[in-house]
């Protein structure tokens, strides 16, 4: 059967065109074109202030994802902590199916739980409080009513504050909480978990299940996970 591919944490922006080029190369590759599905598990973009923002970056990415979708490859998207405001309009434009925070897939007979990963970092209490606020539907609606220029400035300010806070936070609280993660996997009756967010690419075998962490994309490196009947493996971009 055809494989599925998983990516996350590309953090695309105009400042890093090399990352956009890496993604476009992957989407145009023979491997992606022959896939059963491609799953984007959040933080496709470095920030997102609304589907009404039109830029060359957003348009080119949506165009290439749509081309892949038109070939018969199912493309699914889970919102991340940077692009949680991506809505149905952009997903429709790109030919992507928007998934909830948690979904369970039957991947070659293995029940697999997928998510972005930020909700698993339960030791970071300050972030979870912030997340609850920005995920309030009423506040999101009010934010999206602001002029685009204001939203962009506010998003930039929030990113600066977040970057400064990360520099002083203990590294362990920014990783997943092992006990909570194991409970989530059991609650969804899964035997494998795939997530991103922490940027700590690795395949863990723990607590009776497999936890696969997708890495972030940086410089000329793309973290791409291929899952097929033989299992799950990270593949370099040149093999795609």
UniProtKB/Swiss-Prot annotation:
GO MF, one example: manganese ion binding
Subcellular location as annotated: Cell inner membrane
GO (cellular component) term, any one: cytoplasm
CDD domains membership: MPP_YbbF-LpxH (cd07398)
UniProt keyword terms in alphabetical order: Cell inner membrane, Cell membrane, Hydrolase, Lipid A biosynthesis, Lipid biosynthesis, Lipid metabolism, Manganese, Membrane, Metal-binding
Pfam families reported for this sequence: Metallophos
InterPro entries to which the protein is assigned, alphabetical: Calcineurin-like_PHP_ApaH, LpxH-like, Metallo-depent_PP-like, UDP-diacylglucosamine_Hdrlase
Binding, Mn(2+) 2: 43, 81, 116, 197
Enzyme Commission (EC) number: 3.6.1.54
EC top class named in words: hydrolase
Pathway in which this enzyme or protein is active: Glycolipid biosynthesis; lipid IV(A) biosynthesis; lipid IV(A) from (3R)-3-hydroxytetradecanoyl-[acyl-carrier-protein] and UDP-N-acetyl-alpha-D-glucosamine: step 4/6
Domain of life: Bacteria
Broad class of the protein's primary localization: membrane
Chain positions recorded as Mn(2+) 1 binding sites: 9, 11, 43, 199
UniProt membrane topology term: Peripheral membrane protein
Family per record: Belongs to the LpxH family.
Job of this protein: Hydrolyzes the pyrophosphate bond of UDP-2,3-diacylglucosamine to yield 2,3-diacylglucosamine 1-phosphate (lipid X) and UMP by catalyzing the attack of water at the alpha-P atom. Involved in the biosynthesis of lipid A, a phosphorylated glycolipid that anchors the lipopolysaccharide to the outer membrane of the cell.
Protein name: UDP-2,3-diacylglucosamine hydrolase
Species of origin: Neisseria gonorrhoeae (strain ATCC 700825 / FA 1090)
Lineage of the organism: Bacteria, Pseudomonadati, Pseudomonadota, Betaproteobacteria, Neisseriales
Name of the gene this protein is made from: lpxH
